[in-house]
């Protein structure tokens, strides 16, 4: 509540607990915010859910991250779960959906070959090494081809969430550079953020950015840093920078 706190400390705690953080800049909004928070907490029905990733011999996991509704890096939080499998914590779930981005590297093979590169499922690890399956499973397929169009085109969902992850990163970098007095660096990073927010349809983040920069050309990422920025506006942008929007249907 208010602005007498460090954003990175609070968001770091929220990330460690697989939760979320937000700001209540105006104390008048505390009651409504607390009500929403309690409704969300009471709506959580399943606790300690893990994303289990199995990969065959020779396959390397490059990264695992949540990309919606917020960006959350999970790669370094893996716990081994048997031969070729690992669990990545996702916390408690209610009636909701989340999107994850998994990247694996497979060994070389001949043209026309196909293999199962990974199997993803949602489970609840239990004492004694047993596990409760939640019935959700996805298969990652790798195919070797010389079709340049197929091998070089990026899946629209992957492209979208790669942009959303970059958006969160450049906002953080831009605000850090602004605090450090690097005007040119901050302008470049926040300009890129405006460009990404506009391209992905992230209107909420675009509005928050507009309180920190004057937008000259959103499509080109041309902006000017505002001479005076309210501390609450800057903290709100930083706190909510990891919130994403889903791919447009």
Predicted regions, residues:
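General structural signal for secondary-structure boundaries
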Residues: 1, 26-29, 135, 151
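Acidic, polar loop-rich interaction surfaces within structured domains
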Residues: 3-127
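Long, acidic serine/threonine- and proline-rich intrinsically disordered regions
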Residues: 104-249
């Amino acid at each position: 509540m208010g602005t007498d706190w460090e954003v990175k400390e609070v968001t770091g705690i929220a990330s460690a607990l697989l939760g979320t953080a937000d700001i209540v800049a105006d104390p008048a909004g505390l009651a409504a915010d607390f009500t929403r928070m309690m409704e969300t907490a009471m709506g959580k029905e399943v606790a300690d859910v893990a994303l289990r990733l199995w990969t065959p011999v020779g396959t390397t996991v490059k990264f695992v991250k949540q990309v919606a509704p917020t960006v959350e890096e999970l790669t370094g939080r893996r716990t081994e779960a048997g031969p070729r499998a690992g669990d990545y914590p996702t916390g408690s779930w209610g009636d909701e959906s989340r999107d994850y981005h998994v990247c694996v590297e497979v060994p070389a093979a001949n043209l026309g070959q196909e293999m199962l590169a990974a199997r993803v499922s949602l489970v609840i690890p239990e004492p004694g090494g047993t596990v409760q399956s939640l019935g959700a499973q996805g298969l990652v397929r790798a195919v070797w081809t010389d079709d340049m169009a197929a091998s070089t085109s990026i899946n629209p969902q992957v492209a979208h969430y790669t942009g959303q992850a970059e958006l969160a990163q450049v906002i953080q970098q831009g605000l850090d550079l602004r605090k450090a007095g690097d005007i040119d660096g901050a302008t470049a990073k926040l300009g890129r953020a405006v460009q990404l927010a506009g391209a992905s349809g992230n209107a909420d983040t675009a509005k928050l950015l507009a309180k920190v920069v004057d937008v000259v050309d959103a499509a080109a990422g041309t902006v000017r840093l505002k001479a005076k920025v309210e501390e609450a506006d800057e903290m709100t942008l930083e706190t909510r920078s990891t919130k994403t929007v889903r791919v447009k249907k």
